[in-house]
Amino acid sequence: MSAIDNYQDEEEDDIVCVNEEIETGHPRVTILHPPNERIVPPLNFCPVERYLYRSGQPSNVNFPFLLNLKLKTIIWLANEEPQDALLEFCDDHNIQLQFAAINPDGGEDDNPWDGLTEHSIRNALHTIVNSESYPLLVCCGMGRHRTGTVIGCLRRLMGWNLASVSEEYRRFTGSRGGRILVELLIEAFDITSVEIDREKAPNWLLTALS
């Protein structure tokens, strides 16, 4: 049927059940219910692969959304610590917070514009290729360049060509566009340095590598 089938009793009038035909001819039931809390994703949030997500730094308003993801691990890509609210959120919900880009001493492979190094990228990828860390969120301050670097290196590991990797990276950089140094780092990163345990790797990665 194409009309509203049924409303709940008056005491449940905040719930509406709709039974309608969609273009394919198959019935679809949609149940609308106002959430108890605002559900707001973090800045630049996007699924990357199954149970793998990316975003900017989450704040208090994003925590109800993150709870729905049932995160086990958050990779934080920055030299500075995240906000206290995020630290407390991870502690309260038993989420492992991994600092993948803390590099106070620097080094010859230091990436001066954002603190990322070959070593920190590799550490992040070692976590990402282990399904025991999932569901997993990769994030940095704005979810643009640092996160884009790690995800770009992951895409190369998956066999993507550089044009596709660059297109995805630039999709999150906003009106200022991408940084050529980021794209050069992604291109130069040694993907053979990332060890993959196939018994623990996510299925989508195994499919990409097959």
UniProtKB/Swiss-Prot annotation:
This is Putative tyrosine-protein phosphatase OCA1. SUPFAM superfamilies: (Phosphotyrosine protein) phosphatases II. Residues 44-204 form the Tyrosine-protein phosphatase domain. Belongs to the protein-tyrosine phosphatase family. It catalyses: O-phospho-L-tyrosyl-[protein] + H2O = L-tyrosyl-[protein] + phosphate. It is found in: Cytoplasm. Keywords: Cytoplasm, Hydrolase, Protein phosphatase, Stress response. Its EC number is 3.1.3.48. Pfam families: Y_phosphatase2. Putative tyrosine-protein phosphatase required for protection against superoxide stress. One of its GO terms (cellular component) is cytoplasm. It comes from Kluyveromyces lactis (strain ATCC 8585 / CBS 2359 / DSM 70799 / NBRC 1267 / NRRL Y-1140 / WM37). CDD domains: PFA-DSP_Oca1. The active site is at C140 (phosphocysteine intermediate). One of its GO terms (molecular function) is protein tyrosine phosphatase activity.
